[in-house]
Amino acid sequence: VRIPEPQSRPQELNQVVFACKRFMETVCQNRNIEIVMDLSEESPVVNLDNSLFEQVLVNIIKNAAESIDRDGKIYIRTTVRPTCLEIADTGKGIDKDTETKLFSPFFSTKPNGQGIGLIFIREVLLKHDCRFSLRSYPDGLTRFKIWFA
């Protein structure tokens, strides 16, 4: 997956998140999935390419919605210190074996998946000098966490 060099500018993370939430609400409402926002009072300002990062967020939220299928919740949270964005879902979760393969080219758990969505996400986040993790936790939530430099 070839990703263009990011054209990064200072952005308020909460505004970027809110724009993506509005875009994904229709998809989620059709599946009876509630998007719950917990955005920090002070909006973190991060350097990012708005267009690329919105594609990352839409991909993550879409994956979360597909994992839930119907009747669940997606939680979106931002924090300032550390500057972090977390997207958690009540979907079916990720087992340990799958977790190790998630960012491998052409690996997918979806019947017709091509395995390029997470590769795209990984490449964009690396180009933004972000650290990230994707795993399921004992509380039943699967969390995609992104830490900004």
Question: What does each of the following model-derived ranges do?
Answer:
Residues V1-A149:
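Core catalytic ATP-binding domain of two-component histidine kinases
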